[in-house]
Amino acid sequence: MARALPIRVVVVTMYESALETGNHFGEFRLWVERLPLNERIPFPYGFRDLRYNSEKSVIGIVSGVGTARAAASIMALGMDPRFDFTRAYWLVAGIAGVNPLEASIGPAAWVEWVVDADLAFEIDAREIPAEWSTGYWPLGKTRPYEQPVEADGAGWVYRLDPGLVTWTHWLTADLRLDDPPALREARSRYSTSRRLRRRPLCCAATRLAARPSGTALF
């Protein structure tokens, strides 16, 4: 049996609309083009073939949209005997929305806490009680922000390595991100938000995941 490839970094993305051609970009194509991930590895049990950079020992995967596809794809990758993930770092790279009162368009946010927001209740905004600030609350509770908080998050709250997240944020805090004319024009429409008018930057956030539209909370 051939020796398993030692992997240093796994880049996990959810979707890509046009990996090979076209002007539409999802979450994976720029990784393929710019890192680059220039080798294709067949991955019959996954959503799409894998991409690999042998010099950097970096592998990239498109997991597919939704919890079921993501779980199946990552399980298939983790159990694939062709790869050794013993010392690998996992970078989950996704697109999320952001409150325009908190950050500009196009930031890169490093996340310490990940919350699975599928496991929750939500009611029609027209029926939210007047004293509530939101109509969204977790399973096992009867109202938003009800105490006490579950000690272990009941399996839907995950904390990533805080030291690694802090180090990564420090390392990229002064990184100058792209700020093309189209992006500047888009944020100029938000004239009342001082933070949104700033150029994009690297920041820290919490990820609310697995909703129809992911959200980064600052």
Regions found by a protein language model. Name each.
Residues 1-218:
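Accessory terminal and edge-of-domain segments that mediate assembly/interaction
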